[in-house]
């Protein structure tokens, strides 16, 4: 009986003390800022991420190229009473119109935040860059951020 009790206590101690590492799992698609900006490739990945955010449907993938803006400018005709008519007649209180503009502004500021993260880290880590990539990455991040602010 004592032997069984010792095994039980030992097993309980292993389970209680050993679970912390198993529960601390980092998702493969996320990375910590320090890890991301430790190498030149991390800065490039962050910049590519900003471009990918820009091509979302809520920004230049749809709303700010050929749908929402066209209805606001009244370039397109619509056949039914829909949110497109509300866009064309500037009824901004419509729930779908509000959601559309909310997603546009939210995505704009996500892109600005991504560029700000790059710019906050790039000057302190010039040593990780080769050739002229420092100027290239910093210039593109500044340009994207300026473009987003201009469009807002």
Protein language model features and the residues they cover:
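Sec-dependent signal peptide recognition
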Residues: 2-10
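Conserved, well-structured interaction surfaces
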Residues: 44, 82-152
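Acidic helix-start/capping segments at beta-turn-to-alpha-helix junctions
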Residues: 67-74, 137
């Amino acid at each position: 009986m004592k032997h069984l009790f010792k095994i039980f206590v030992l097993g309980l101690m292993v389970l209680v003390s050993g679970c912390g590492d198993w529960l601390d799992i980092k998702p493969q698609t996320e990375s910590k800022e320090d890890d991301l900006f430790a190498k030149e490739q991390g800065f490039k990945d962050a910049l590519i991420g900003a471009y990918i955010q820009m091509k979302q449907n809520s920004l230049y993938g749809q709303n700010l190229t050929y749908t929402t803006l066209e209805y606001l400018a009244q370039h397109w005709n619509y056949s039914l009473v829909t949110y497109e008519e509300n866009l064309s007649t500037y009824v901004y209180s419509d729930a779908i119109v509000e959601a559309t503009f909310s997603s546009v502004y939210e995505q704009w500021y996500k892109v600005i935040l991504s560029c700000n993260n790059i710019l906050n880290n790039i000057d302190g880590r010039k040593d990780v860059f080769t050739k002229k990539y420092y100027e290239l990455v910093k210039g593109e991040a500044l340009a994207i951020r300026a473009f987003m602010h201009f469009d807002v």
